[in-house]
């Protein structure tokens, strides 16, 4: 995928050109604002995210992309000064409704962080932990089947099948990140959020994670924050560009990278700022 560089006079004015993704999105955000104390970090975000696809969030550091990502599974609840306004619906249900248990929500919406964070447990127990506490397995055999299936989906089973009872922290960085993805998959989520999942990995491990993301998108709604526009172009079907706490533009990834509608998007993807 190449980046088109139209003359400045042909570019769209600097107004938001974000558009709904589908008529029936998996995730639907409207008027989302985030405050940390008196400081507003996110301004009136409207965004639709489709099911069974990869949506990439791009933008310079501090633009609000990770802040918005954390709204989807209410991770901002863990920050005492944070306040979220607006609505985020998953399959039509507001994640911020008082009746929603954040723990249950986070089993539906898994999260993979920037640095691999396996539990200080065995490889098996890392994956078994979620299904066990959520009562997803009725016995040992079913739990073992979930662990095996999750590790296979994460592309890790063949590498660890003979050492399941060794510490997860003994794996390489790329293997640890795939273990974390297996842990998320094990509780049968509907959405997987990834906050710069490859930033701490070498190119070979990054390529394996990207291959895994491509394989998983047929089963899950995946949202990835990345500073790498090349990665966004490789793994995503839709892209959303954030700048200064605002969603500037969203749309099909190929269109965003070859024919952006907003001048700020064009400037960012061509390296004029960021």
UniProtKB/Swiss-Prot annotation:
Q: What is its main location?
A: membrane
Superkingdom classification of source: Bacteria
Q: Does the keyword Membrane apply?
A: yes
PROSITE patterns on file: ABC_TRANSPORTER_1, ABC_TRANSPORTER_2, PSTB
Task: Identify the residues that bind ATP.
Answer: 59-66
Q: What is its EC number?
A: 7.3.2.1
Q: How is the protein disposed in the membrane?
A: Peripheral membrane protein
Q: Where is the composition biased (Low complexity)?
A: 11-23
Q: Where is the ABC transporter domain?
A: 27-269
Listed Gene3D superfamilies: P-loop containing nucleotide triphosphate hydrolases
The similarity annotation says: Belongs to the ABC transporter superfamily. Phosphate importer (TC 3.A.1.7) family.
Complex formation: The complex is composed of two ATP-binding proteins (PstB), two transmembrane proteins (PstC and PstA) and a solute-binding protein (PstS).
**Could you identify this protein by its name?**
Phosphate import ATP-binding protein PstB
Per the UniProt entry, what species is this protein from, by scientific name? Caulobacter vibrioides (strain NA1000 / CB15N) (Caulobacter crescentus)
């Amino acid at each position: 995928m190449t980046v088109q560089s139209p003359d400045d006079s042909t570019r769209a004015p600097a107004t938001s050109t974000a558009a709904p993704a589908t008529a029936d999105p998996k995730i639907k955000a409207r008027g989302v604002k985030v405050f940390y104390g008196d400081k507003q970090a996110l301004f009136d975000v409207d965004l639709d995210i489709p099911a069974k696809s990869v949506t990439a969030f791009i933008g310079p550091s501090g633009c609000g992309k990770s802040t918005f990502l954390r709204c989807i599974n209410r991770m901002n609840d863990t920050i005492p000064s944070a306040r979220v306004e607006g609505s985020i619906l998953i399959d039509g249900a507001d994640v911020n409704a008082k009746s929603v248990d954040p723990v249950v929500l986070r089993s539906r919406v898994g999260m993979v962080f920037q640095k691999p964070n396996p539990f200080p447990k065995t490889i098996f127990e890392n994956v078994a932990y979620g299904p066990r506490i959520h009562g997803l397995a009725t016995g040992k055999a079913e739990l073992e089947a979930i662990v095996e299936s999750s590790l296979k989906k994460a592309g890790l089973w063949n590498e660890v099948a003979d050492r399941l009872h060794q510490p997860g922290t003994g794996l390489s960085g790329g293997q640890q990140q795939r273990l974390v993805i297996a842990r998320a998959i094990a509780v049968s989520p509907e959405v997987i959020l990834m906050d710069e999942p490859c930033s701490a990995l070498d190119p070979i491990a990054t390529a394996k994670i990207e291959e895994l993301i491509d394989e998983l998108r047929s089963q899950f709604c995946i949202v990835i924050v990345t500073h790498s526009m090349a990665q966004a172009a490789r793994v995503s079907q839709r892209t959303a560009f954030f700048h200064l706490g605002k969603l500037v533009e969203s749309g099909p990834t190929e269109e965003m990278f070859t024919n952006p509608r907003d001048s700020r998007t064009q400037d960012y993807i061509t390296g004029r700022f960021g």
